[in-house]
Regions:
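Residue-level recognition of single "structural anchor" positions
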Residues: 1-200
Length: 200
């Protein structure tokens, strides 16, 4: 927002509020669940502390679960969400919000996914093999982290979901670049007015 303010000659708070309004408009409608073959995994954002490895309980890290349609040779649509922990309840949020019950789902062997098999009949777990069995998913995780660092530099736990919504709004419309701006403007017009106090 500092860069936006300097470039367009407005106050930093004005630029910040406008950016947040844009991100609000980019939020998923949850009306178009992922279908066919879907891969799911988790990752962390934050500074690792000494002695912390794997799925740690560190307060220094932000935990995210990601789901991605897998199409032959390329990725389809995707979604992600900040989660509290790696429990079945937390992981299940992205399934409920963004994955079709008929999808063919693949995850790694983490035990938190096992209870979800009861609700999703086409569910497979296989070893990650250090990411080798989920290459496309890990590419998208790296792409998101690079985008977050390169474009926004910093975010906190309270705003990370908004950056995630922004990223996947763009990602899911890569094939519709000519209409993405018009789509976004229409969303912003239809939204109820947003004030600084309402999103502070």
């Amino acid at each position: 927002s500092v860069w936006l303010a300097e470039r367009h000659g407005v106050k930093q708070m004005t630029a910040w509020l406008f950016r947040r309004k844009v991100q609000q408009a980019m939020k998923s409608s949850n009306n178009f669940p992922l279908e066919n073959e879907v891969h799911v995994d988790e990752f962390e954002i934050g500074t690792p502390q000494k002695g912390e490895q794997g799925r740690s309980k560190s307060a220094h890290k932000m935990r995210v679960v990601i789901a991605l349609e897998y199409r032959v040779g390329k990725a389809g649509r995707g979604y992600a969400k900040v989660i509290k922990d790696y429990s079945s309840k937390s992981l299940g949020e992205i399934f409920e919000m963004h994955i079709s019950k008929d999808a063919r789902i693949t995850t790694d062997g983490w035990s938190g996914y096992k209870p979800l098999m009861k609700e999703y009949p086409h569910f497979e777990q296989k070893l990650s093999n250090k990411g080798q069995n989920f290459k496309m998913l890990h590419i998208q995780i790296r792409n998101f982290k690079n985008w977050l660092r390169g474009v926004h530099s910093y975010c906190n736990k309270e705003t990370l979901n908004q950056y995630i919504e922004e990223y996947f709004f763009r990602f899911n419309r890569l094939n519709f670049r000519e209409s993405i701006l018009e789509n976004l403007l229409c969303r912003m017009v239809r939204k109820n007015p947003i004030t600084y106090k309402s999103i502070k």
